[in-house]
């Protein structure tokens, strides 16, 4: 810095990484570089990733569901399925909250009544068939066959693209609290 020289990334300069990412010029395209890294990994050759993974805390899995026939199951998606018009104005990306919508008495989710507002994928197929995100039709079949006790009367939805970890954890805490209070002991979580 004192010499007013360009400061390069930590992997070149040897300082502790700060988490900042910089645009860099490379002779090879990203596709070529990642293919070379993948081949090195597959052939057990030494390699260095360009984007190291952050360490995340370990989350213990939920207890095993012993008897599905006595279980109320909730449905949740990060695919952004909402009633047409997005009445709660959920964000298409970088979500800070989630929606909770009644499915009480419904056997299916109809095209034109629900739509996906997710900003990270082509939502055409999900909007044309909402069961791709919330499989209510199949769950009602399982309920009618006695294979599960019931489907929870609401489904939950948000858009998972770009949501930060702390916000996700807070939403998860609120959801878990709501589900426990409602007697729900299992959930099906779909993602895109």
Region locations from a protein language model:
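An N-terminal assembly and electron-transfer interface module characteristic of large anaerobic redox
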Residues: 1-192
């Amino acid at each position: 810095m004192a010499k007013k020289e360009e400061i390069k990334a930590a992997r070149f300069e040897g300082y502790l990484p700060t988490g900042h990412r910089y645009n860099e010029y490379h002779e090879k395209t990203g596709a070529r570089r990642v293919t070379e890294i993948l081949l090195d990994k597959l052939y057990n050759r030494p390699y260095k990733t360009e984007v190291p993974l952050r360490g995340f805390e370990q989350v213990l899995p939920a207890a095993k569901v012993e008897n599905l026939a006595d279980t109320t199951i909730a449905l949740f998606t990060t695919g952004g399925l909402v009633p047409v018009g997005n009445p709660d104005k959920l964000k298409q990306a970088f979500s800070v909250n989630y929606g909770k919508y009644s499915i009480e008495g419904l056997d299916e989710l109809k095209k034109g009544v629900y739509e996906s507002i997710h900003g990270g994928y082509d939502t055409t197929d999900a909007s044309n068939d909402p069961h791709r995100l919330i499989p209510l039709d199949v769950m009602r079949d399982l309920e009618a066959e006695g294979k599960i006790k019931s489907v929870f009367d609401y489904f939950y939805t948000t858009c998972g693209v770009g949501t930060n970890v702390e916000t996700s954890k807070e939403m998860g805490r609120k959801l878990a609290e709501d589900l426990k209070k409602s007697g729900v002991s299992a959930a099906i979580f779909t993602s895109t």
